[in-house]
Curated annotation (Swiss-Prot):
It comes from Alkaliphilus metalliredigens (strain QYMF). This is UPF0182 protein Amet_0022. Keywords: Cell membrane, Membrane, Transmembrane, Transmembrane helix. InterPro entries: UPF0182 (IPR005372). Pfam families: UPF0182. The chain crosses the membrane at residues 14-34, 60-80, 104-124, 166-186, 208-228, 256-276, 286-306. Belongs to the UPF0182 family.
């Protein structure tokens, strides 16, 4: 056979081998390829193909050059290893040709290049984009004077890059060892080939080290240079130190640890030089000097730090740490967005009257006597109707109802396919038939039926509304339980909702889904792992597959870099249903900011409001915080993903809420960081905690509550979220934190501080007074012994005018069977009074007296037909007005008596008691006249 024929034969072998490799590669990655195609179609259907392609383009821009360069470098490195091996053993005699060996080395170089490029492109693509597009925070840290964005977006990439380089170095060490082991096994040097200075012996590892000394030396130099870079970046970790009295760099960190890091940088650079020296001297033992010197610097630094902390800082801690406490205070408040809280004094008094109650009837009408937990139970028992329908959660929102601004409970009725009967668990039912949930349950928070259940404004099948809110598109194709893919526009009609003896059916009229025509039907059959899709006669060219319908999955697939709230809530707008979800930008790299979140995170912003159409599945991202540099960086990377909040339809914008998750974090931080004075903060002289309450029969921290409230100085009620504070070891109320939700005031935080010279009851004190009230406690015990359990609802703190009203509903549930909880009583507390009545109105009447209009009506009925009735009515009305004035005067005199008692002014105290006696006598005479 001629040389040309041999060459041709070898080429054919190479081509065949390459073809086999490509086939195996494609077959092995077929699933990934199909997922890539179908995911692209999914993004395209939503209008976010640019988001999908940004990731792909960036990975290719990183991966392809890195693959080419990496493969070449790996190949040259392997060739260098081979040559070095034969050079060391002074032999170039080989069993196979030099050319053949070089060809064989192409394959591992290709594999290593592919591994490295795919790993780096897959893990670093987003970090690189963040680094390249980072927007400034316009705030610098106090130690190194870097913009905060450097720590939030740039430093994480640099650290990740060093980790990647370190991993590649370890891979190079492994490659070197494995290569020389293989070479040693297939080409062990003969007696005449061994160099005299190698001292070749039976100790394989010593021999290996002698041969690979050059490569290990080169890798060692790079390693110590990388280590120096790691120590350089590690300096910035001092901003997150936990050594001092607060989070962040302390006195010891800035005066000792910082210099230890710098010494370790120098030691690492000297170690790199030492590796070169060890190689030149051919003495591997000299390599031990490098790690020993670095470790010694670290140990010495720790000893010095310990000494400085114990003998310089601790004896005079407040003076040494004062500047760092100030940094911690300032940067923690900035990181959690509590620096803009408006702090104001609450002009507290106990002079609330019946007239004030009537003037604030909008607030009274929105006091929540229903609790969302019992309401959820009720919805699932009386509005689910079928086992496969489920209300996952009850959300609190506000709507204009019949011209009034009302707070409501709202819950979507979703279809849970897992609850279909065993016989109904078929592919047709799960994919074509039972495709969507239906409608919502809507209730006012303050109204109950005669049986103590929530009044349902929106209910049943088909959806019925007793108010002026309508839902014309009640189907829910996208929700929290929609985990199964479905196919719409098929020959099989979809189940819509149950009727008495039949089922209503429908066909999908929306825009969601990828068409199942052409090759798509085969692609999605493969993706879903079923032949039924391919063989079903119900599927036509007009059919569409709808997958990834779960709203959480949907958001995470589009924008996984955003953290989403775990409590999506449903909104009605123009007859359609929409999901609204809060999105957060979170980081754990804000300098000096105390971590208060899971994962040691210490920065949070509610930067995104996500809206998902429950029928069509469209997903819209609206930027709600245009001052957050992280979301602005995301917007620079994905310009087609985000929209300004002004683009949100007004009907939806009216339902955005200040997120409870963010408010709870901020309220927890504010309990400590309301103290601005660093000395007060150091001594924790004014430390607060979120108030305690008794829920059910257990004591717990009060849950922040959405409610309607008329804030001091405002003319109308608004939707807010609030939480009360008490001193850390006391139970009297110290402050009330409120976040506004409506209109231009959205996002404003106000802290109302209670006067320190008055005892303002905290929720726990009210709970204790309820327990101490003989009448109430006896009734609670009686109900609890009669085969029922008593559930004490959330205690609500309701500001009205300059006073505080406390309201707590009581629920009764039979301990046997599947009985529903019902509102049994409402407890109301004001000042020193506590009453329990079947309704809120009756409880208020007991405290403040009945409405004048109601009394007039009763009197009019009693005197109807009497010729003097009008005169009698006028006299009684005048008497009621006089009694009201006397009650107000008695309250004022009583307050004066208490103030005199606190000041030890017993003369004024006695005068006040005498005046109080006169007022009470006049009141008694007036009431006797009314009774007659």
């Amino acid at each position: 056979m001629s040389e040309e024929e041999k060459e041709l034969k070898n080429r054919k072998k190479v081509i065949i081998g390459l073809g086999i490799f490509i086939f195996i590669f494609l077959f092995g990655f077929l699933s990934e390829i199909l997922s890539f195609i179908t995911d692209y179609q999914w993004f395209q259907e939503l209008g976010y193909e640019s988001v999908f392609l940004t990731k792909l383009k960036t990975q290719l821009q990183i991966g392809i050059p890195l693959f080419i360069v990496g493969t070449i470098l790996y190949y040259l490195y392997l060739i260098g290893l081979k040559k070095e091996y034969y050079k060391q053993i002074k032999s170039y005699h080989m069993d196979i040709s030099e050319k053949r060996v070089n060809q064989i080395l192409i394959l591992p170089a290709f594999v290593f290049g592919l591994m490295t490029s795919t790993s780096v492109a897959g893990s670093l693509w987003f970090d690189i984009l963040l680094y390249a597009n980072a927007k400034p925070f316009n705030l610098t840290d106090p130690l190194f004077n870097n913009d905060i964005t450097y720590y939030l977006l740039e430093l994480p990439f640099l650290k990740q890059l060093l980790n990647t380089v370190t991993s590649i170095l370890f891979l190079m060490v492994i490659i070197t060892v494995i290569f020389y082991v293989i070479m040693f096994l297939i080409r062990r040097p003969t007696l005449y080939e061994v160099k005299a200075d190698l001292q070749w012996n039976s100790n394989f590892f010593v021999s290996l080290l002698q041969i690979a000394l050059k490569q290990f030396a080169a890798l060692g130099v790079i390693f110590f240079l990388v280590l120096a870079a790691r120590y350089y970046l590690g300096v910035y970790d001092l901003l997150y130190s936990t050594r001092g009295v607060v989070y962040g760099a302390s006195y010891t960190d800035t005066h000792v640890t910082l210099w230890v890091y710098r010494a370790q940088i120098l030691a690492s650079l000297l170690s790199a030089t030492g590796v070169v020296y060890a190689y030149v001297k051919r003495n591997p033992k000299l390599l031990l000097i490098a790690p020993i010197s670095i470790i010694a610097v670290g140990i010495l630094g720790n000893v010095i730090s310990l000494g400085v902390q114990n003998f310089i800082v601790s004896p005079n801690e407040i003076a040494r740490e004062l500047p760092y406490i100030e940094h911690n205070l300032s940067y923690t408040r900035r990181a959690y967005g509590i620096g803009e809280i408006q702090e104001t004094d609450f002009p507290y008094d106990t002079e609330l009257t019946r007239e004030d109650i009537e003037n604030n009837q909008e607030i009274i009408d929105n006091i929540r006597i229903n609790d969302y937990r019992p309401a959820l139970e009720v919805y699932n028992q009386i509005q689910a109707f079928r086992p496969y329908y489920r209300f996952v959660d009850v959300d609190i929102d506000r709507y204009w109802v019949n011209g009034e601004y009302r707070q409501v409970f709202i819950a979507p009725r979703e279809l849970d396919q897992r609850e279909l009967s065993d016989n109904a668990q078929t592919w047709i039912n799960q994919t074509l038939k039972y495709t969507h949930g239906y409608g919502v349950a809507l209730s006012p928070v303050n109204e109950v039926t005669s049986g103590g259940q929530p009044v349902l404004w929106m209910r049943n099948f088909p959806l019925v509304s007793s108010v002026d809110i309508e839902v014309t598109r009640p189907e829910i194709y996208f929700g929290e339980l929609t985990d199964q893919y479905i196919i719409v526009n098929t020959k099989e009609k979809e189940f819509d909702y149950p009727l008495d003896n039949d089922n209503a059916e429908t066909l999908y009229e929306g825009t969601a889904g990828v068409p199942l025509k052409g090759v798509n039907r085969l692609l999605y059959s493969w993706r879903q792992g079923t032949l039924k899709m391919l063989l079903s006669g119900n599927i036509t060219s007009e059919s569409r597959i709808v997958f990834d319908r779960n709203i959480v999955t949907r958001m995470n697939k589009i924008a996984p870099f955003i953290t989403y709230d775990e409590d999506p809530y449903i909104v009605i707008n123009e007859g359609k249903l929409y999901w609204m979800i809060d999105g957060y930008t979170i980081s754990g790299n804000f300098p000096y900011a105390e971590p208060y979140m899971a994962g040691n995170n210490n920065y949070i912003r509610n930067s995104v409001k996500v809206v998902i159409d429950a029928y069509n599945g469209t997903v819209d991202y609206y930027i709600s915080d245009e001052e957050d540099p992280i979301i602005l960086t995301y917007q620079a990377i994905f310009p087609d993903l985000f929209k300004p909040l002004d683009d949100m339809p007004e009907g939806l914008k009216a339902h955005i809420r200040y997120p409870q998750v963010l408010f709870d974090i901020q309220s927890e931080v504010y309990a400590t960081y309301h103290m601005n004075n660093p000395r007060v903060f150091y001594n924790k002289e004014d430390l607060w905690r979120i108030a305690r309450e008794k829920y059910d029969q257990n004591e717990q921290t009060i849950e922040s509550q959405y409610m309607m409230m008329k804030l001091p100085g405002e003319e109308s009620e608004e939707f807010v979220i609030s939480v009360p504070y008490t001193p850390i070891r006391l139970d009297n109320m110290r402050a009330l934190l409120v976040a506004r939700n409506d209109g231009e005031q959205y996002g404003e935080l106000i802290a109302y501080r209670m006067p320190k010279d008055q005892n303002v009851y905290g929720p726990k004190q009210i709970e204790d007074r309820i327990d101490q009230n003989t009448t109430i406690s006896q009734n609670l015990s009686l109900w609890g012994e009669g085969g029922s359990s008593v559930i004490r609802g959330n205690l609500l703190v309701v500001p009205i005018e300059n006073s505080l009203l406390y309201v707590e509903p009581l629920y009764i549930r039979a301990t046997s069977g599947t009985s529903l909880p019902e509102v049994k009583m409402v407890i109301v507390s004001f000042g020193d009074q506590i009453v329990m009545e079947p309704t809120l109105e009756e409880a208020l009447n007991r405290i403040f007296g009945a409405r004048v209009e109601e009394i007039r009506e009763e009197i009019q009925e009693e005197v109807e037909g009497d010729t003097d009735g009008e005169t009698i009515t006028e006299e009684i009305t005048e008497g009621l007005g006089e009694a009201s004035q006397l009650i107000r005067r008695a309250s004022e005199v009583f307050d004066r008596a208490q103030e005199a008692s606190r000041q030890g002014n017993w003369s004024a105290y006695g005068d006040a008691l005498e005046e109080l006696e006169q007022v009470l006598r006049q009141l008694q005479e007036t009431t006797q006249v009314l009774e007659n």
